Structure formats: structure tokens, C-alpha cells
């Protein structure tokens, strides 16, 4: 672009399954983390459905120029390594402090409702919810054809227990 603006257009591999859940969850996760103050690229637009002019699912997101840590790690001096590790541990601490009500993948509530007919388990910010697990291991190959529960899964402590008599 003429003004230096750059963005990334991402489309899923043909074997990505299920595309809707994968794209919808990735976008919701990125936007949720960004709204929580974590340094995540901005998502400009997305479609978890192929029902659009491009005829494919997509994510249009901010391009961030930088250097891969793995490219410079071996040349870093000890103070730089300590600084990097401190920054990473601070980010991880912030990430792990975000409460989630259930196991599964993160979605925009309205996206999940469109495809699953359910709103999932809401977060404090009700734009977001926890829904089916979108990890590839849950859907790979013929697993995508199985009619099984993929989440959300509430913690065991939330299940009612009947005391033995």
C-alpha cells in the first residue's frame, strides 16, 4: 500500500476442520486477549463462513513487523535474556489470571449461536462465550463426522453430587 499500511489475509487450509469453529474461535480469542490488554494483532475483518464474496473463510488482521526471537536468542547477552524472560512471564501471568467458566474454545456469542444454535457458557463480557473445543485433535479425519460432545465442559466441581445414603 502507498501509505505503508500492511495487513495479513489468512485463509484456512483445505483440510482445516471445522473451518467455521476454527476461524470464529481464533478471531474471538484474539479480540478478547487484545481487549484484556495483551499485545495481540488487531483483527480488521473476518468471516467464519464461506458465504461471502471471497467464497472462503478468512481473517484480515494487522501485520506486525519484527524479528523472531529464535533468530536472535543465541546472540543475546544475559541481561537481555533476563529481560525477555521477565516480559514473557509477565504476559503469561496476565494470561493465566483471566478466569474462564469452562473448558472449550472461545467464541463471540453471536457467532456460536449462528452455527450451533446455542450461546455456550458466557464470560463476564457477554459478547464472548466458551463453546466447543476447536482444536484439530477433536475434529481430525473421521472424528469430524462423530456426533460427540466437544464442549464446553464445566469443571468437575460444578457438577452436582448426590451424597451416598
Sequence positions of predicted segments:
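ATP-binding pocket architecture of kinase catalytic cores
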Residues: 1-165
Amino acid at each position: 500500500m502507498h501509505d505503508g499500511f500492511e495487513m495479513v489475509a489468512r485463509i484456512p487450509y483445505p483440510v482445516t476442520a471445522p473451518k467455521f469453529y476454527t476461524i470464529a474461535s481464533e478471531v474471538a480469542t484474539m479480540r478478547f486477549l487484545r481487549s484484556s490488554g495483551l499485545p495481540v494483532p488487531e483483527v480488521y475483518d473476518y468471516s467464519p463462513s464461506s458465504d461471502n464474496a471471497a467464497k472462503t473463510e478468512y481473517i484480515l488482521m494487522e501485520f506486525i513487523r519484527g524479528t523472531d526471537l529464535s533468530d536472535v536468542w543465541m546472540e543475546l547477552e544475559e541481561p537481555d535474556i533476563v529481560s525477555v524472560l521477565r516480559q514473557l512471564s509477565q504476559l503469561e501471568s496476565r494470561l493465566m489470571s483471566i478466569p474462564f467458566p469452562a473448558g472449550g474454545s472461545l467464541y463471540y456469542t453471536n457467532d456460536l449461536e449462528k452455527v450451533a444454535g446455542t450461546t455456550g457458557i458466557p464470560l463476564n463480557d457477554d459478547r464472548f462465550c466458551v463453546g466447543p473445543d476447536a482444536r484439530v485433535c477433536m475434529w481430525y479425519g473421521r472424528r469430524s463426522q462423530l456426533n460427540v460432545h466437544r464442549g464446553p465442559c464445566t469443571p468437575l466441581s460444578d457438577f452436582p453430587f448426590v451424597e451416598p445414603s
